[in-house]
A protein has these predicted regions:
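Membrane-interfacial segments
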Residues: 39-40, 73-76, 80, 116, ...
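Secretory targeting signals
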Residues: 24, 29-64, 68-69, 100-161, ...
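Helix-loop-helix units of permease transmembrane domains in multi-pass membrane transporters
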Residues: 70-104
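Aromatic- and glycine-rich beta-strand/loop motifs that create alpha-glucan
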Residues: 1-25, 250
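Alpha-helical transmembrane segments of multi-pass membrane transporters/permeases
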Residues: 161-173
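Terminal transmembrane helical anchor/hairpin motif
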Residues: 46, 171-246, 251
Length: 251
């Protein structure tokens, strides 16, 4: 699988995929650091909530749509999927290779941005942060995004880059309204685009006392969210792989 992932990464050379993976998170983090530097009395809680809300509700839905769309679009341009579908590698391995490439890109994006943000916070407001909590939240954001990546990979193959980007824009609205506001308090568990938003907030439980009434409730919600992510990833990834075994390209 490492060899397949390496091969998939080589295909992204001179494409927008690498720009999205490495350039976009740097710009995003630097903009936030500049904002922090220009304000007095900024707290770690404020930065934590603001950054991860924007990242999970806006950047991840749009980024997943763009990354999946571009990765599959490159295969479409390279002979209309013929080389892609007629590879000596099994269909399941090809599909998983694309999925793991998406995970690698999203993970790189998220951790690059978070590390730069933490470094910037340390310069702008020394000692004003819980950096382990930030990194844990970044990990939870990536984990919560796995079902979304599986959905976008399937959509990109089935309908193309336009559908993937369009779905990402719809996911942005769902993530912002259902994941980031009280409107979705009772239904967020049913909406995959709300999962990274909610999961990225749960590591803040570290800042609560274990005797706080909210502590136990937060932990229970976190476990429910993780169970939903595991189930969603299994369903969408397995469904996509079964469908891909018989797929012969778009007409």
């Amino acid at each position: 699988m490492i060899r397949i992932l390496s091969s998939e990464w080589l295909k992204t050379k001179r494409t927008a995929v690498r720009w999205i993976t490495f350039f976009m998170p740097v710009v995003t983090a630097l903009c936030i650091v500049a904002y922090i530097s220009g304000r007095a009395g900024v707290t770690a809680d404020f930065v934590y909530e603001g950054f991860f809300t924007v990242w999970t509700a806006v950047i991840i839905p749009l980024g997943a749509g763009l990354l999946a769309g571009f990765i599959i679009h490159e295969e479409e341009l390279a002979g209309g999927f013929h080389g892609f579908l007629n590879s000596e590698v099994s269909r399941d391995s090809v599909y998983l290779g694309k999925f793991f490439l998406l995970i690698f890109c999203l993970m790189s994006c998220t951790f690059i941005s978070t590390v730069i943000l933490c470094a910037g916070m340390n310069l702008a407001a020394p000692g004003n942060g819980y950096y382990a909590v930030f990194m844990t939240a970044a990990l939870f954001a990536v984990i919560g995004s796995l079902p979304i990546l599986a959905i976008h990979l399937w959509i990109s193959l089935l309908w193309g880059i336009g559908a993937s980007i369009g779905t990402g824009m719809g996911g942005l609205l769902m993530g912002a309204l259902i994941g980031a506001t009280s409107l979705g308090d009772k239904i967020w568990i049913l909406v995959p685009w709300a999962w990274p938003v909610k999961l990225s907030m749960f590591p803040a439980v570290y800042l609560l006392s274990r005797t706080d009434p909210a502590f136990g409730d937060t932990v229970r919600q976190m476990m429910t969210g993780l169970a939903a992510v595991v189930t969603g990833t299994a369903v969408f990834l397995t469904g996509g792989m079964i469908w891909f075994r018989k797929w012969e390209g778009r007409a």
